[in-house]
Amino acid sequence: MKRTLKILLCAALTAAICIPVLADVPATSSGLVATSAILSATEHSGETDVTADLLDGNTATAWVRTSPAAPDLSLALSGASVGEIWIRSGYCYNQNYYNSYDRPATVAVTIWYAYGQQSVTYRYTLSDAFLPTTSSADWSNGYQRLLLPEEYTGVTQVDLTIETVYAGRGNAGAAISDIALAADVHATATPR
């Protein structure tokens, strides 16, 4: 059964372009944090469309890795600009769900840019914290920021591979509640 993506807000980049925006993700220097025209999110273990669970901004839904395939997820885009990725790691419905499932510890992010002609991969270490109330340049509303060293244009795909996990207490599979991509930012840090 295929579910459709619910767009929470819509903000205009230009008079002609309207992109979905997650309501509880922080604004960038340009005032927009968007899913950057993400067309779909695909889990590679079974080529399953998981767009609704990853892009709905709802902590009651999550994508859970069913097998250690590489890459775990692919986000298809339509030539967008991407400068950072915001991720809610774990199944964030409540503290019990969060502790039950594995959470990504180290992730590899591959950016396919220049309209699919080039790619680059970065590795990030995520913190293990259930919806922290901290608000900073790297945290907001439970989202952690993965800042790319530069903004990439013509991005057609973002692959995410979970390399290591923080172990959960029972349920199998690493969970991610939500992902958002931000454009029009100026990178000021290197990957952690």
What are these regions, as identified by a protein language model?
Residues 1-8:
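Bacterial N-terminal signal peptides that target proteins for export
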Residues 10-20:
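Bacterial N-terminal signal peptides
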Residues 24-76, 99, 187-192:
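Disordered, acidic Ser/Thr/Pro-rich linker "stalks" and the adjacent N-terminal cap
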Residues 67-72, 93-187, 191:
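Trp- and acidic/polar-enriched beta-sheet ligand-binding modules for extracellular glycan
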Residues 69-70, 77-86, 154-155:
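Extended extracellular/luminal ectodomain segments enriched in beta-structured repeat modules
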Residues 80-99:
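A short beta-strand element within beta-rich, extracytoplasmic domains
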